[in-house]
A protein has these predicted regions:
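C-terminal motif of bacterial Sec signal peptides marking the signal peptidase cleavage site
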Residues: 18-20
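Bacterial signal peptide processing site
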Residues: 22-24
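Beta-propeller domain segments
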Residues: 47-62, 127-129, 137-139, 207-362, ...
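A short helix->beta-strand "capping" segment at the edge of beta-propeller domains
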Residues: 59-81, 173-174, 308-309, 359-361
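Surface loop/turn motifs at the tips and blade-to-blade linkers of beta-strand repeat domains
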Residues: 75-81, 116-124, 179-185, 243-247, ...
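Blade-loop segments of beta-propeller domains
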Residues: 112-135
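Asp-box/WD-like beta-propeller blade repeats and closely related beta-sheet repeat scaffolds
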Residues: 159-194
Length: 408
């Protein structure tokens, strides 16, 4: 059936009365290496200023105050090549996606030398092998899922496939395509995939440098998609017959569930074009919600669009995000922990689950480990983080990228 376009002309006209210009054409999610500077060098965390509206906290400078909870960083694995995502297996082993197209196995906290799978990817810009997730019933079917930039008859597309790990864990075979023809560009490819508490697969996509696609429910770009483990559209999706679940996204790489029906979603803001920069954000979202891009990107309230919970005026940008559910750091319990790339820290955000308002936000590990890409809770109740220092935008150490455990 023909699906409605949720971008209303009335909303655009109202915004034109509020702002000086309409949103410009998109550029990269992060500044290229040659011109990139550290947000924290410009504004130390201890000197940040925040302003809170009725429903949105604006961090006007810096990233947030320095966190006061003592935490400890443990190196779990080194020698990885841009580890983009982690999928924990029932026995606590990890499958790790390396952006160049390799799936690796970490067994008993040791990186296995054998490559589990090599996927033919296009890793230009922000493409490549991105997210990875294990089937909820992995113990019986050995299925895992990957999001990657594929070459389809000479034209790149973003795709989600299902693979099956061998019993020995030394190899994997492709099973099927789950979602295909997700729009692709050099930048803004999204890429995070996770299974929700309902057993469905959620897929975060970018706007592929075409902001209008984020508001078009007929496009898979700039969305969070929701499909069954076999790639079918669930009957209770908000747009009939469509995998589209949440719209109005620029380039999400992180989301997690506060309850069965509510997600906290991080998103990249504008990249500096025509005077706009930063404005990375976290929003509280449910099925059918519109997070506003490109109609809104600040702490703005517009009818029919979700007002962000928090907006950082200076760029983070956010990578993976996880709600802390462990006991090792009890002060963090229930907080959203966001990995920051350019700003090189972990951001802790405390959001009231009832009102959606930010109660507290603070910075940890500032500059200690460089660029941080993924953040995910492990089955042991600990937080795991991947570094992204060898992605061409950081300083790649001799031991390459790492998986870190954040504990007490």
């Amino acid at each position: 059936m023909k699906l409605p376009n949720i971008l209303r002309h009335g909303i655009i006209l109202a915004l034109l009365a509020l702002v000086a210009c309409t949103p410009p054409q998109e550029q990269a999610g992060e500044t290229p290496p040659s011109t990139e500077t550290s947000t924290q060098e410009e504004q130390p965390a201890s000197q940040t200023v925040s302003a809170q509206s009725a429903s949105c906290t604006l961090v006007e400078s810096g990233s947030g105050p320095q966190g006061q909870v003592n935490v400890r960083v443990e190196e779990v694995v080194t020698g990885l090549d841009v580890p983009w995502g982690i999928a924990f297996l029932p026995n606590r082993d990890m499958l790790v996606s390396e952006r160049a197209g390799r799936v690796r196995l970490v067994q008993n906290n040791q990186l296995r030398p054998q490559v589990v799978a090599t996927i033919n990817v296009s890793d230009r810009g922000e493409g490549g092998l991105l997210g990875i997730a294990a089937h909820p019933d992995f113990a019986s079917n050995r299925f895992f899922y990957v999001y990657f930039t594929a070459n389809a008859n000479g034209s790149p597309v973003n795709r989600v496939e299902r693979w099956q790990l061998s019993q020995e864990g030394t190899s994997a075979t492709r099973d099927r395509t789950i979602v295909d023809n997700i729009p692709v560009a050099q930048f803004h490819n999204g890429g995070r995939i996770r299974f929700g508490p309902d057993g469905m697969l959620y897929i975060g996509t970018g706007d592929a440098r075409n902001p209008d696609l984020s508001q078009d429910v007929k496009s898979l770009a700039g969305k969070i998609l929701r499909v069954t483990p076999d790639g079918q559209v669930p009957a209770d999706n908000p747009f009939s017959g469509s995998p589209v679940y949440i719209t109005g996204i620029r380039n999400t790489q992180g989301f997690d569930w506060v309850n069965a029906s509510t997600l906290w979603v991080s998103d990249h803001g504008p990249s500096g074009e025509l005077g706009r920069s930063g404005h990375d954000k976290v929003s509280v979202a449910q099925a059918g919600d519109n997070l506003g891009w490109p109609t809104t990107y600040r702490c703005e309230s517009v009818q029919g669009l979700v007002t962000p919970a928090i907006v950082w005026q200076q760029a983070l940008p956010p990578g993976g995000a996880a709600i802390y559910t462990g006991d090792a750091i009890p002060e963090w319990k229930g907080s959203l922990i966001v990995a920051a790339l350019r700003a090189e820290h972990l951001q802790r955000v405390v959001i009231d689950p009832q009102s959606g308002q930010v109660q507290r936000h603070e910075v940890y590990l500032q500059g200690q480990e460089g660029r941080l890409r993924d953040a995910i809770m492990g089955p042991d109740g600990e937080l795991y983080v991947t570094t992204s220092n060898c992605d061409g935008r950081g300083s790649c150490p001799p031991e390459q990228d790492k998986i870190l455990r954040i504990t007490r």
